[in-house]
Amino acid sequence: LDIGINAIQAVSSKQAIFINDECRVFVIGDLDGDLPALKNALNNVNFDPERDTLFCLGDFVDRGDKTYDLFTYLQAIRACMILGNHEHLMLESLLSNDKAAFNLWTDNGGNWHKSVSSEKLSVMCDELLTKPLSIVLEYRGYIIGLSHTFAQSWDWENYPDDKSLIVQSLLWDREVVKQNKVVKSHGVDFSIHGHNSTKAPFWVGNSYHIDTNYYGGKPTLLELSEVIATLD
């Protein structure tokens, strides 16, 4: 991994969450700073933040100029956010003064930060550091892995000790999709990821890849019960 992990070192690698069966649970792919697209997707399913839960698979920052507003909105609706490689770039750029990270960040949609105050950016970074690199969700009898991406032969029950390897595997890896091998997401019934841009969601083994915002023109919002219904 060419980008340092000084800032992201302290972030939790995995968070376990249980949600009652009667609750509606949604998962959304990369948002790329597009607040109107998020609101439109949620309105289409009559999302109620008092009753429903939203999981974001990372890369909610960058590209769109509404990144800061999008982040505060996600907080307001109590969305469960997972970090992606763009959040990693932001944290290392602003907190670690990592020049390689900053150059890559600003070349790939990070320039929105120039119009946001340093105070707001500082608060945002502090909040991002409280978000995990992955979530293992128990819902309706299924164990579901959620992360920005994942590596071949990833074992959700046994993470490596090397934090840089975890970051590389869960935030940056593209080998599973590039090679299109039937790989298994070990230790979970299935897993859901963003990161790998596609026009339509697709399965590789028991992993589901839903980053449609870049090529498909809008983010994919899944209702988890509907995904589970196709597996039962």
Regions found by a protein language model. Give the residues of each.
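Acidic, histidine-bearing metal-coordination/catalytic regions of metal-dependent phosphoesterases
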Residues: 1-23
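Beta-strand-turn-beta hairpins that frame and shape the catalytic cleft
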Residues: 19-26, 137-145, 204
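Active-site neighborhood of phospho(di)ester-bond hydrolases with catalytic His/Asp-centered motifs
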Residues: 28-29, 54-58, 81-85, 146-147, ...
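Active-site environment of divalent metal-dependent phosphoester hydrolases
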Residues: 32-36, 62-65, 87-92, 152-154, ...
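Active-site neighborhood of divalent metal-dependent phosphoester bond hydrolases
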Residues: 67-137, 141-143, 160, 165-178
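Short loop/helix-cap segments at secondary-structure boundaries that form the rim of catalytic
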Residues: 73-74, 200-206
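Binuclear metal-dependent phosphoesterase catalytic core
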Residues: 208-232
